[in-house]
């Protein structure tokens, strides 16, 4: 990805799975619970402690392409982040016989499989997203924003907030932000890929080609999740990027230099055409819901990213202060 690669030598797997690391034989696999770009995820049990865990298997291509840089970045970020609403990476384990290459620190010389060991969570938010009570919605949204605020104050963008990446445990009482595969550290003057965030939760600035962006991209995704909680269906279920923009503009209005200074300079702005109606009418579809909840959604889904509410300010909003 343009502007996304870590400099050579900046990340070494040996820093996280040193020689002598435990092997996956220390776990008993129970069942497969998922599959991603780089491998499978299993529910497992630590045969020593009896604790359940989630094993994310990272398949290496016989050393031909080395250890995926995206996974190395995810490991590094998760080792840095420590918050009750962020999934905890407990350790890295290896397949039996896995060995370092010459020198013992070159991640490109690893052989076999590497496993990321996470704390086990019962299920993801998708299972409750369309049938949660108002009090549950508030509880989940508060935890999501707390985890996200912690990421942002530590200069980390998640860049893939969606129901499948929000995990629930503790009898439905604990939410944790997970899957940091697209996450990355950020600076205000950085340039990043805009091919991130699942389409339904992707903000307009990325759809218009922006490469200089910050925390507001995650806030848009949170706003989409919040709206989906209330409506019990996705807010912007586009099938293509163009259709996604059209659905956003239908509810949030058409962007121009008046409501979003600088928008006309974005690479894909000239390719879009005004939709009808162009007036913002987002609040109209939430007229039967709690006014404080609607106010917060409205502030999360502002077209101009510089005007979107921050995670910190969202946590201070009237929605979280008022009793149900």
Curated annotation (Swiss-Prot):
Modified residues (Phosphotyrosine): 38
Keyword Nucleotide-binding found: yes
EC number: 2.7.11.22, 2.7.11.23
SMART domains linked: S_TKc
Any single biological process term in GO: positive regulation of transcription elongation by RNA polymerase II
Active site positions: 160
Catalytic activity: L-seryl-[protein] + ATP = O-phospho-L-seryl-[protein] + ADP + H(+); L-threonyl-[protein] + ATP = O-phospho-L-threonyl-[protein] + ADP + H(+); [DNA-directed RNA polymerase] + ATP = phospho-[DNA-directed RNA polymerase] + ADP + H(+)
Family statement: Belongs to the protein kinase superfamily. CMGC Ser/Thr protein kinase family. CDC2/CDKX subfamily.
Protein name: Cyclin-dependent kinase C-3
Species annotation: Oryza sativa subsp. japonica
Upper lineage: Eukaryota, Viridiplantae, Streptophyta, Embryophyta, Tracheophyta
């Amino acid at each position: 990805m343009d502007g996304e690669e870590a400099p050579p030598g900046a990340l070494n797997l040996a820093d996280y799975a040193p020689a002598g690391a435990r092997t996956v034989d220390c776990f008993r696999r129970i069942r497969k619970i998922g599959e991603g770009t780089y491998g499978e995820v299993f529910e497992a049990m630590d045969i020593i402690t009896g604790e359940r865990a989630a094993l994310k298997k990272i398949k290496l291509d016989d050393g031909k392409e080395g250890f995926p840089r995206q996974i190395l970045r995810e490991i590094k970020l998760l080792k840095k982040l420590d918050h009750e609403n962020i999934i905890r990476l407990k350790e890295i384990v290896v397949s039996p016989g896995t060995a370092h290459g010459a020198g013992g620190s070159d991640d490109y010389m690893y052989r076999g499989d590497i496993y990321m060991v996470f704390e086990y969570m019962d299920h993801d938010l998708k299972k409750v997203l369309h049938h949660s009570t108002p009090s549950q919605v508030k509880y989940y949204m508060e935890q999501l924003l707390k985890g996200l605020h912690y990421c942002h104050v530590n200069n980390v963008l998640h860049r893939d907030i969606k129901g499948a990446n929000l995990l629930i445990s503790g009898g439905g009482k604990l939410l944790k932000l997970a899957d940091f595969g697209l996450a990355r550290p950020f600076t205000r003057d950085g340039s990043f890929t805009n091919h991130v965030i699942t389409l339904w939760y992707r903000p307009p600035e990325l759809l218009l080609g922006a490469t200089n962006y910050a925390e507001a991209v995650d806030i848009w995704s949170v706003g989409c999740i919040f709206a989906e909680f209330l409506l019990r269906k996705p807010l912007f279920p586009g099938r293509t990027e163009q259709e996604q923009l059209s659905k956003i503009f239908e509810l949030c209005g058409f962007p121009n230099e008046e409501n979003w200074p600088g928008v006309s300079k974005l690479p894909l702005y000239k390719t879009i055409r005004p939709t009808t109606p162009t007036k913002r009418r987002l609040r109209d579809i939430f007229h039967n819901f709690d006014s404080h909840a609607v106010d917060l959604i409205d502030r999360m889904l502002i077209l101009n990213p510089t005007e979107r509410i921050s995670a910190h300010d969202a946590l201070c909003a009237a929605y979280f202060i008022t009793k149900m």
